[in-house]
Swiss-Prot record:
The gene is vraX. It holds the Pfam family VraX. This is Protein VraX. It comes from Staphylococcus haemolyticus (strain JCSC1435). The lineage of its organism: Bacteria, Bacillati, Bacillota, Bacilli, Bacillales. InterPro entries: VraX. It comes from the Bacteria.
Amino acid sequence: MIIYKQNIENGIPMYEIITKTFKTITVKFDETFNKNEIYKLLSLLENDLDNMKLGY
């Protein structure tokens, strides 16, 4: 899956998800992106992440 921040609606970040199969995922973000948001994003990929090696 590819996930990227699409826009903010009523103060809530909205994401667009493109389904693909990848061996690695890179998430890039700026200083406005907090740690809780990364966990929300990764939870969307839970099934895919079960088979991946994570590093940060």
